Amino acid sequence: METSILSGLEASKALYSSLESRISHLKDRGIVPGLAAVLVGNNPASEIYVKNKTKKFESLGLKTDVFRLEESVSEDKLLSLISKLNTDSEFHGILVQLPLPKHIDSEKVLNAIIPTKDVDGFHPENAGLLSIGKPRFV
């Protein structure tokens, strides 16, 4: 078997070209895809990651909102926000930036995101689809 080097830049360009076309078709139908990014606390690495994601989304003409919560937010309040975002038609995807504070059950929070809005693919349904070669988003 021959080894080859994958060009991340070339793969990225091809992916974004495909995305631009798909986004254009959605916008023609009056749909502007939206991402809700949830950031708890002020972890510098998480801040950079979310900033880069939202910048890329915005460059594609997509709607992005970052929901910033204090490090001390209760799990119930975070779950309430997830529940609200699950039913908000402006957002087609939800990203909860990890790590979460120790007093919050990350698994419980990630499982609260409805599978069709789980952009990270952490929900058991999405992980299962990926494991059988039928990924929802990847």
Give short role names for the model-derived ranges:
Residues 1-29:
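Positively charged, low-complexity intrinsically disordered leader regions
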Residues 32-41:
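Short beta-strand segments enriched in small/hydrophobic residues
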Residues 4, 59, 84-86, 113-117:
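Non-catalytic terminal and connector segments of soluble metabolic enzymes
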Residues 95-138:
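Anion-binding alpha/beta catalytic cores of soluble intermediary-metabolism enzymes, centered on
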Residues 77-89:
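Short, well-structured alpha-helical segments in soluble
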Residues 35, 57-72:
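Short beta-strand elements in bilobed, periplasmic/extracellular small-molecule ligand-binding domains
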Residues 40-55, 133-138:
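Glycine-rich phosphate/diphosphate-binding loop of Rossmann-like nucleotide-binding domains
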